[in-house]
């Protein structure tokens, strides 16, 4: 049994980020916290094995306790950092990071060739919309916000497949 998520609205950016990744078999959630993102991914991809990693042993313990009985071993959590992931090379089809910046080289190491890295970032459970949101997104682009993420992707040898956000439904920036 998997416990229901407490923070489902905050996971909207993660849901949008993994819309187009097919059916991954092995998923890693970086900086998983108490497991909301990993639990969401387990529901979204019912045949996948989901692993969460977090630098805090306390949060890893809390996340593991939330999983409940998982006789299939589909969901598990480990302590680790984005710069030193405790997993073998070329292991995951999908690596996700919700409000965390993964270490590009280490992420590339654990991601299988052809796999996906989905980074979802927001500072609010509600996306910015309307005139104020459009103005802020325009201003962020002018200040180089997009190049920061695309540059980070390039550090690990990644190509940006999709960059979206701001409006509900993932309208492009």
Question: Which role fits each region the language model picked out?
Answer:
Residues 93-104:
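A short SAM/SAH-binding and catalytic strip from SAM-dependent methyltransferases
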Residues 83-95:
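A short acidic, Gly/Pro-enriched loop at the edge of an enzyme's catalytic core
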Residues 6-25:
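Conserved alpha-helix/loop element of class I SAM-dependent methyltransferases that forms part
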Residues 23-33, 118-139:
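Conserved class I S-adenosyl-L-methionine
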Residues 103-116:
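A short glycine-rich, Lys/Arg-flanked "PGG" loop and its adjoining helix->strand segment in the class I
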Residues 149-173:
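Core SAM-dependent methyltransferase catalytic element
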Residues 36-83:
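Class I SAM-dependent methyltransferase SAM/SAH-binding core
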